[in-house]
Amino acid sequence: MEKTKTSPLSFIKKWCYDKRLYFLVFFLPVAIMFSAYAFFKIHPIGDSSVLVLDLNGQYVYYYEQFRDAFHGNGSFIYNWSRNLSGEMFGVFAYYLASPFMLILVLLPRTMMATSILILQLAKIGTAAVTFMFFLKKISVQKPKTISLIIFPTMYALMSYMVVQLMDPMWLDGLIYLPLICWGVHRLVDEGKLVPYIVPLALMFIAHFYIGYMVGIFTFFYFCWYCLSREGRILPKKFFSRCVAFGIGTLVALMCAAFVLITVYNSLKLGKFEFTDPDFSLATQFDFLTFITKLFPMSYDTVYPEGMPMIYCGTAVLILVPLFFMNDRITMKEKTSTGLLTFLLVILMLSLIHI
């Protein structure tokens, strides 16, 4: 029997219809953020601009250099316009390695401020999409549509995301993290390495600095999932999964080695001399003050003396107690989740001052 051929247009229409919830989740936080920009008269609505602090005094010039190099008017390796000239790859790896940087090369150089705004909104929307993907994949039962809309929106508009829009290179961590955590689930449940290796390697390539922090959290998440998942993991299987986790992490690092090794050599040229860590025990802030950051309108500063940016919606204040009161959630899941939360809070207190 002859199969009916599907036209490309029909295929695209069907694909868009099937993925309509992903499109909604992408554009909802984007629309909210753009509305906030419009309210504050940010260009192109008003005369203000997204170019603030380091984004205005430093990053935008790197972006222009990146765009010029992409169009053949410069180099990704060496830059003669730096003070007395200098290598460029270290700058590229820290500020410019994100795939979202391609947005800046598609629009004219005169529209740089608009390009950066689009880049910011694209990262917000993509973070919501990857988080929704994660929720759909890990849910035992089919999640409700409203949950797949609300929680990704809260994730994409958490205070860290909004505040760090002025440091857009740091936002890739929120995009790759749900994919990496899903990879951890696949590794523990099925022993598959590729879903874990690929997003982790991409994270290290996109931004090595945020990448190592994501890697540390991934280790904690791996331990949490092994302890909290349904069904007991036999010691032999647990050991094999730990070995697989270590191998997968090593392979991801090797995949990103062309960036990591070059960055290390770049830092040896001078950046290491600016670090003066103090490993004495010290707390950065009062715990009660820390609690206030769970509420809206609690932003203080982006400077080191500022508090952690942990606000992700007032619903959390209700849902967290309900989680621990829910009888359908096992005690081992509550215990492991409580331990992980406690560990993260302790780490944010920064007992070792660096």
Positions of the model-derived regions?
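Structural signal for the C-terminal ends of transmembrane alpha-helices
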Residues: 36, 107, 136-139, 183-189, ...
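Membrane-embedded helix bundles of polyisoprenyl
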Residues: 30, 124-137, 144-188, 192-228, ...
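Hydrophobic core of alpha-helical transmembrane segments in multi-pass integral membrane proteins
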Residues: 26-37, 317-321, 345-348
